[in-house]
Amino acid sequence: MLGTDIGIDLGTASILVYIKGKGVVLKEPSVVAFDRDTNKIKAIGEEARLMIGRTPGNIVAVRPLRQGVISDYSVTEKMLRHFIQKALGKRTFKKPRISVCVPSGVTEVEKKAVEDATLQAGAREVAIIEEPIAAAIGAGIDITRPCGNMIVDIGGGTTDIAVISLGGTVVSTSVKIAGDDFDEAIVRYMRKKHNLLIGESTAEEIKIKIGSAYKRPEVITLDVRGRNLVTGLPKTVTVTSDETEEALKETTSQIIEAVHSVLEQTPPELSADIADRGIVLTGGGCLLQGLEELIEEKTGINTMTAEDPMTAVAIGTGKFIEFLSEGPSDN
C-alpha cells in the first residue's frame, strides 16, 4: 500500500491536518494537558483546551508552540504523533510523507526542530514550507507566475507578511504579534479599565463576538464575567465594540507597520502588481471584524480575505506535498 501524503499547519493556537484526496480532516487546539506529579499526558487538543484555567494544581494545560516555533520539543512530538494517528486512523501500513509549514522568519535550528519532531512522530519524509507560500497556494493564488502577490497570514502566534513571485518569496517579515496578542490586549484592557480579571478563553469570546479593529457602523455590547480586582468577588461588566477597538489599537498598529515595511522593500514592478491585485489576508486572526478595512485604509491598497482563511495554510501545505510527489509538470 502507498503511504499517505499529509500537510500539517503546525500553528501556535491550532493544528490542522490535510490529507490528499480528502482535504482538511482535523482541526484541534495546539494544547496538551498533563499531570505534573506523574508527567503523564491527560488530554490533547480540544479536550485539553477545555481544561485551561479549570484544572486542579497537579494538572497543567500547556501550548508546546510559542509564536510559531517549538518551545517544548517532547510535548510537541507527542502531540504531533497523536494528531497524525487520529487523522489517519488505523488504515495505514506505511509511514506518511508529511509537509509542515513554519513562519518565514524562523532560524535553521528552529526549522530542524520541526523536521525532527515530525520524523519522531512517525513521518517517512518531511518537507518544510514557509507559511506565506502555503497560505498563497491555499488561497488559490498561482504563485508560479512572474507576478507580485502579497499575503498577510495572521495566525495565533505570528503574522507572516510576504510578497511572492515565481514560486518564491521576494520580501517577507514575520512578526510575533497575532491572534493570541489580540486576546492578551483585551485581558490587559479589562484589567486596566474595569478592574476585572478575565481568562484567555473569555478574552477570546469578547474578540469573536464584539471585537473590532475598525469602528463598526453600530455599537454592540457583551456582558463579561470575571473577578473584581478590588473586592476579589465575581463581577459582570458590559463591554462595547468601541472599547475593543481601543483595546486592540496598539496590536493592530504593529501589524500595519509590518505591512508598510514589506511594501517599502518591494521592487517597483511587483509593487504595481500588488496595487492591481490587492492584498490577500489568511489565518484565523484575519477574521477580526474590521481588520480588512483597517489595512485597506492605512495602505490605500484593495484588501480582501481569502475564501476560507482558517484552512488556507493547511490546504497549501497539503498541495505542496502533492506537488512534490507528482513532480513538476511538463510546462
Tell where the protein language model's regions lie, with residue ranges.
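Nucleotide/phosphate-binding catalytic cleft detector across ATP-hydrolyzing
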Residues: 1-154, 162-280, 286-331
